Every structure is written in C-alpha cells, then in structure tokens.
Design a protein with these regions (language model features):
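Secondary-structure "cap/kink" motif recognition
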Residues: 1-323
C-alpha cells in the first residue's frame, strides 16, 4: 500500500511539473511576434525608383537626395551653410539598397498602436526616414526605421501608411546614413571608361619653366597602363565649390573616350603654413551620342573634391613618366 502511495505522489508531482511547463510555453508562444513574408519596398516597383530621400533627424546635415539621370545617379546635399553639393553617386550602392529593401523577408509584428512609435524610434522625428519615389515624384513608399537590436540583428520600422511596427533582419544598416562620402562615386573620373586621349597642363604662372602640355594617345608608350592607373585613383572628402574660391589653380587634366565624351579636371592647392591641401573641380563635355539626361547630369555637378598629395603626385608621375 505504501508503494502505491509513493507511486501516486510521484505521478501527481510529475503531472504538476508538466502542467506548469505547458503554461509557460503557451504564454511564451502567445508573446512571440508572428512573422509574415513581405518586403519593405514592393518588388514590382523596384525598377521604377528614380529618386530616394534619406533624412536622419539627429544629424545636423542629415538629409540627402538621390536622383536618377540617364545612366547616372546624382546625389544632392544641402549644407547648414546654405550651400549645396551635387555630385555623382555610386550607382552600385544605390542599386544594392533598392535590391535589399525589395527582397521578400520575414517581418515580425511588434505593435499596432501609434503610442509605441517613440519606444521603437519609428516616429517622424525620431526615426531615419527613407522615401522611394518614381517619375513625377510619385511616392511608392515612405519608411521610418527605428533603433536596432544588435543581439538579434534586427531593426524596427514602419510604413508611413500604417500604424503597425515591424522588426526584421538588419542587413541594410549601412545604407541608413546621409553621409556624402559613403554614397558618392569614389573614382576621380567615373564618367570615362575607355580613354583614347589624355592631356595634362601645368599652370605656368606657378611653376618656373614647366614642361609644355603633355598629350598621350593610344599610340603612346604604356597608354593602357597609364590610363588604367588614372581611372583607378580615388578622391577624398567632397566640399562645396566655394572651398576653392581662394585656392591657387595649378594644373588641368583632360581625358577623352572613344565616343567623344571629355572629362576636364582643374586642380587647385591651398597652402596654410606647412600644410598643403589639394582639390579638383570637374566638368564633363558630353559626346554626340549622350542622351539629354546624361548631359543634364554632367552640367548639374557642383562640388570640389579633395585629394591627397600622394594622389596628385601619382597623376603627374603617371603622365610624365617615360614608360
């Protein structure tokens, strides 16, 4: 009889433990966000995007706009000083951003009330806002991205058209910035692909007895190597054009491709004591086959590009070297 009592007691204890566990997991399951398969940007519209705006409210100059013009993407940046920078953006980064946001992914609903916006940082004033637009400023979606959870590698967001806040895998955090240097095309002459002629002229007013203007073409020694070296060089920080208003003009580099498109870079130097800073201003002459959109992109550029002393010397050495 005693053995039977012991068995019954053990059975009751085991049943109680199983009951408690069932309550715990049932409650946990109810609190687990339900996932849906969707995308931040409707994939049907990804090929129609021609303008993107990013606003970062906690940055002084945290606003940047990208506009598709022909074969290029332009970035526009309004500075606190009232000046504007217009430069060529890195098309590969922008296309990657569009692709990422239009991928079907798991979205987890975490809230459906506006009172939770601030806690997830997805309000108009606390979140990073991204607008995807098409032609004629047609708005496809406006998204507010909130804070991220590094442990789960997720980020909170909501669409302007909905009160629902979701979280999803945070595999596009690098794109949520208004930093000009991140988005800009880093190469000094991205508009030229296959050069057929290169010329370089030094300002005679600054250099005593300089060499005459040097011109290289496809028949010149090591032309392919030299042109590839020039096209691989990259610039540094982008500044407003007024930065070089008081700078000394020192030289001009011109590079033309087979279509007749011509890129001209005017170089400037700013001397402050022992410190030297180098900049260039770029202008592009379109070819006869360039579209009106490409031409507009070329003529819209408004910026001064900083380069290192090493980069400037590399340009000179590359062009003037015998081999």
């Amino acid at each position: 009889m005693k053995n039977l009592d012991k068995i019954l007691i053990k059975f009751l204890i085991l049943s109680l433990i199983l009951f408690v566990f069932s309550l715990f997991f049932s409650k946990k399951g109810k609190n687990t966000p339900k996932a849906i398969d969707s995308a931040i940007l409707n994939p049907r519209h990804s090929s129609e995007i021609s303008q993107i705006e990013i606003n970062v409210p906690y940055q002084e100059d945290g606003s940047i706009i990208f506009k598709k013009q022909g074969d290029f993407w332009l970035l526009e940046k309004d500075l606190p000083s009232g000046e504007k920078i217009i430069s060529q953006a890195d098309s590969s980064i922008i296309e990657s951003f569009i692709k990422k946001t239009s991928e079907i992914r798991k979205l987890y609903k975490v809230s459906d009330t506006s009172s939770d916006y601030e806690s997830f940082s997805v309000s108009e004033n606390s979140g990073i806002t991204v607008l995807f637009l098409g032609n004629n400023n047609k708005l496809y979606t406006k998204v507010h991205f909130g804070h991220s959870d590094s442990l789960k590698n997720r980020i909170y967001f909501r669409s302007e058209a909905s009160k629902i806040t979701y979280e999803c895998e945070n595999d596009f955090q690098q794109y949520l910035t208004a930093e000009t240097n991140y988005w800009s095309e880093g190469k000094i002459i991205p508009e030229i692909k296959n050069p057929v002629q290169i010329s370089f002229k030094i300002n005679e007013g600054l250099v005593g007895q300089p060499p005459k203007a040097t011109t290289l073409d496809e028949n010149s020694s090591s032309f392919s190597t030299k042109s590839n070296t020039l096209l691989s060089l990259r610039h540094g920080k982008i500044w407003p054009e007024t930065t070089i208003n008081s700078a000394d003009y020192i030289s001009t580099l011109s590079v033309q491709d087979g279509s007749g498109r011509l890129a001209k870079l005017d170089f400037f130097k700013i001397q402050k004591g022992d410190d030297e800073s180098y900049f260039y201003r770029k202008s592009i002459q379109p070819s006869p086959v360039d579209s009106q959109e490409n031409t507009f992109a070329f003529y819209s550029e408004k910026a001064a590009y900083e380069i290192s002393a090493w980069t400037y010397e590399k340009i000179i050495q590359t062009i003037l070297s015998a081999e």
